[in-house]
């Protein structure tokens, strides 16, 4: 019975451990790009852009419509003609009460510059949709990486705090033994216990923060919320070199703004094209019938006769005056064109400044990270020496606790420097167009 109970408990523990999946940064980035709901919406916008191109191209193709019409003229109209051939001034002819028509109508653009420019505009808009998707994809990669680094940082904090707690627990055992042998004071035991409790609170807060970061990471990569995940451990002291090869002028922000300039130029052209004439080919193939009684259409005879008519022609439409509406559209389009140009220049100069600051920030954070890591390692060595001296009765509890506080302070500085360094590296990778190197 006991064996079965132990087996079930062991199996449950094994299942719980296995249920927690460790995800690398590369795996998270791949999931984010494939599954993120915001990116799926962006991909849907690309599909809509393709459809918009087809809609505008359809305006350049022939349009054929089938038409059918039937009229009941309660008061039939009359036709008045010259009646002198019949010996009277006017000849008045009354039309029949019912008439019907059925046939095909054709209209095909021969020259319509507005429609052609509209196709070009829709293609530019499609390109903007694609660039917007790439920009959104890049933003998701940045957000995923930052969240992943934050979780790694918190996980490392928990590991280091646990190490500190273990050290203090060993110190407490030694101090308790000293107290039992009247070699230390009760207040020394209380001091150690207080520090242990303080670190335990820090660890609990870090555990809560880690769960929140995991929840955010799962949301970004669209990972099942009910499943547990874990990030990989950091490599303490490792420096990732980034090639500061200059600002990448092909950044998606710049490409988007450049395409907006092109779009504004095309929209100006589209407004000007409204002054141009349009030429269309028209044609029809119709059949008409007339009767004085509706039921005659269901009988054979002279009263049920359909008359055919067909023709082909050219329709020319020349804009003359529209209340200065076209002129206002052209002025507005030119203003949009100038705004797009200024927006591009402003963004380019801002990104250049960001790049220079990013290079400086990476160099500074790299030095600071290495220094803080060395300080943390040194603080551990100093504490180990002090703790050994305390065991030998050479130094006091106060000195040991002071060195332990220095370890905690050095740990916090080291973790903050690590996160700042990783984020600075991430920004530089983005600005230099090397974001795909993330792994």
Describe each PLM feature range.
Residues 18, 225, 413-439:
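Acidic, low-complexity, intrinsically disordered peripheral segments
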Residues 40-44, 57-58, 110-137, 187, ...:
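Sec/SRP-type N-terminal targeting helices
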Residues 54, 105, 267-270, 315:
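Outer-membrane beta-barrel architecture
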Residues 19-65, 69, 75, 225, ...:
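Bacterial Sec-pathway N-terminal export signals of envelope proteins
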Residues 51, 139-250, 361:
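Periplasmic alpha-helical coiled-coil/stalk elements that build and connect Gram-negative outer-membrane
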């Amino acid at each position: 019975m006991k064996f079965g109970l132990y087996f079930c408990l062991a199996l449950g523990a094994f299942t719980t451990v296995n249920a927690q999946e460790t995800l690398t940064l590369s795996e998270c980035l791949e999931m984010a790009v494939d599954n993120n709901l915001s990116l799926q919406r962006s991909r849907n916008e690309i599909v809509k852009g393709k459809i918009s191109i087809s809609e505008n191209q359809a305006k350049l193709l022939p349009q054929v419509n089938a038409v059918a019409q039937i009229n009941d003229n309660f008061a039939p109209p009359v036709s008045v003609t010259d009646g002198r051939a019949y010996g009277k001034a006017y000849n008045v002819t009354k039309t029949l009460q019912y008439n019907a028509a059925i046939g095909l109508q054709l209209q095909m653009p021969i020259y319509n510059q507005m429609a052609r420019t509209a196709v070009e505009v829709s293609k530019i808009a499609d390109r903007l949709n694609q660039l917007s998707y790439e920009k959104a994809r890049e933003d998701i990669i940045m957000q995923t990486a930052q969240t992943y680094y934050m979780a790694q940082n918190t996980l490392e904090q928990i590991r280091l705090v646990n190490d500190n707690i273990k050290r203090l627990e060993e110190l407490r055992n030694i101090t308790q033994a000293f107290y039992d042998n009247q070699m230390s004071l009760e207040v020394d035991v209380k001091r150690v216990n207080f520090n242990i409790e303080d670190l335990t609170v820090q660890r609990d807060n870090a555990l809560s923060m880690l769960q929140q970061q995991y929840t955010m990471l799962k949301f970004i990569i669209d990972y099942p919320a009910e499943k547990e995940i874990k990030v990989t451990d950091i490599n303490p002291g490792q420096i990732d070199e980034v090639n500061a090869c200059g600002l990448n002028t092909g950044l998606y922000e710049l490409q988007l703004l450049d395409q907006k300039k092109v779009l504004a130029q095309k929209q100006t052209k589209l407004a000007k094209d409204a002054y141009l004439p349009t030429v269309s080919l028209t044609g029809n193939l119709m059949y008409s019938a007339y009767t004085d009684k509706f039921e005659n259409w269901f009988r054979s005879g002279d009263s049920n006769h359909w008359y055919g008519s067909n023709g082909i022609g050219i329709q020319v439409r020349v804009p003359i005056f529209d209340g200065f509406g076209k002129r206002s559209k052209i002025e507005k389009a030119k203003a949009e064109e100038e705004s797009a140009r200024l927006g591009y220049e402003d963004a380019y100069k801002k990104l250049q400044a960001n790049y220079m600051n990013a290079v400086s920030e990476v160099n500074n954070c790299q030095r600071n990270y290495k220094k803080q890591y060395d300080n943390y390692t040194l603080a551990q060595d100093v504490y180990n020496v002090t703790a050994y001296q305390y065991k030998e009765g050479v130094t006091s509890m106060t000195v040991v606790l002071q060195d332990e506080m220095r370890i905690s302070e050095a740990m916090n500085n080291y973790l903050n420097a690590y996160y700042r360094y990783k984020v600075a590296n991430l920004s530089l990778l983005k600005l230099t167009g090397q974001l795909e190197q993330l792994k």
